[in-house]
UniProtKB/Swiss-Prot annotation:
It is a multi-pass membrane protein. It comes from Artibeus intermedius (Intermediate fruit-eating bat). Belongs to the cytochrome b family. Heme b b562 binds at residues 83, 182. CDD domains: cytochrome_b_C, Cytochrome_b_N. This is Cytochrome b.
Length: 379
């Protein structure tokens, strides 16, 4: 008798995607982040759903409803901090996942890569809107500053900003629509994840060597399911440690002050995972130029496949490219640090230098070094 998991219309889809899926035998722990992101998404949707049951999206009561969740709801504090710090874990996994793709040349699967970029934008939009909901000082001023950037768009900018606000400033209408979209977007993200996996399973996984692995495949279950479960345990332990020992480590103290349109915080800054892009935005004195640089800092990933000049797919055997890659990582850490600093000397010039380096490495140095490595291969 044939196994039901191979014949049942629904089970056979799950079977071919997770159980009998052929996977390269050489996948390292860098390939764990896809499944970890799935767990993060699940945790965020579940905790978010329970938080939404107690939250009120009204400017008069939003801040108090979050306080009520933390003080009066059974394990409400746990839900709130799991959700807030779960977002941080989500972005850590997301950036490591993208970094893995860049290092090992996974971007040559262009459909999977492009859906991934869409996912990155969708998750960033979700996180930004979620940050506005507690209606603290940084929520209000962060929303005001970031949405105001759209006013840099010629001709339609001002009308666009007022349309998004639902008035002439960030107010009740803005908060209500942000809550609606923050609730909706994770389900759109889930749908995009399925498309992402669909395209990935068309081509099969890349591997650390970048060499086709068709002759050497193993079934996903039990090998990679066990490996993934170990990853889950490590990540959930890290999340639990963060939530239970220092839940406010990654947050901003200003967000414990209720939103006040009359008092501007001394330093308006987004959550830590947006600081690199915020630093790039601030490094350009022109408003429209800054907005374009901000968008391009992420959108630049879309042209990475076009800039791939190397004869080898992966950076595993390309020491010069590896040096450049880790320089890029150092530049991103520098930008993240600068994004959290005030706009004054010497931070301004450091931020501008790091921003120029970021684009220079991706657009010019990486392809040039790849061509040099191709030339050295002939020797």
């Amino acid at each position: 008798m044939t196994n039901i998991r191979k014949t049942h219309p629904l089970l056979k889809i799950i079977n071919s995607s997770f159980v009998d899926l052929p996977a390269p035998s050489s996948l390292s722990s860098w390939w764990n982040f896809g499944s970890l992101l799935g767990v993060c998404l699940g945790v965020q949707i579940l905790t978010g759903l329970f938080l939404a049951m107690h939250y009120t999206s009204d400017t008069a009561t939003a801040f108090n409803s979050v306080t009520h969740i933390c003080r009066d709801v059974n394990y409400g504090w746990l839900l709130r901090y799991l959700h807030a710090n779960g977002a941080s874990m989500f972005f850590i996994c997301l950036y490591l996942h993208v970094g893995r793709g860049l290092y090992y040349g996974s971007y040559t699967y262009s459909e999977t890569w492009n859906i991934g970029i869409l996912l990155l934008f969708a998750v960033m939009a979700t996180a930004f809107m979620g940050y506005v909901l507690p209606w603290g000082q940084m929520s209000f001023w962060g929303a005001t500053v970031i949405t105001n950037l759209l006013s840099a768009i010629p001709y339609i900018g001002t009308e666009l900003v007022q349309w998004i606000w639902g008035g002439f400033s960030v107010d009740k209408a803005t908060l209500t629509r942000f809550f609606a979209f923050h609730f909706l977007l994770p389900f759109i993200v889930t749908a995009l994840v399925m498309v992402h996996l669909l395209f990935l399973h068309e081509t099969g996984s890349n591997n650390p060597t970048g060499i086709p692995s068709d002759p050497d495949m193993i079934p996903s279950h039990p090998y990679y399911t066990i490996k993934d479960i170990l990853g889950f345990l490590v990540m959930l332990t890290a999340l639990a440690t963060l939530v239970l020992f220092s839940p406010d480590l990654l947050g901003d103290p200003d967000n414990y002050i209720p939103a006040n349109p009359l008092i501007t915080p001394p330093h308006i800054k987004p959550e830590w995972y947006f600081l690199f892009a915020y630093a790039i935005l601030r490094s350009i004195p022109n408003k429209l130029g800054g907005v374009l640089a901000l968008v391009m800092s992420i959108l630049i990933l879309a042209i990475v496949p076009i800039l791939h000049m190397s004869k080898q797919r992966s950076m595993m055997f390309r020491p010069l490219s590896q040096c450049l890659f880790w320089l890029l990582v150092a530049v991103l850490f520098t930008l993240t640090w600068i994004g959290g600093q005030p706009v004054e000397h010497p931070y301004i010039i450091i931020g501008q230098t790091a921003s120029v380096l970021y684009f220079l490495i991706i657009l010019f140095l990486m392809p040039t070094i790849s061509l040099l490595e191709n030339y050295l291969l002939k020797w």
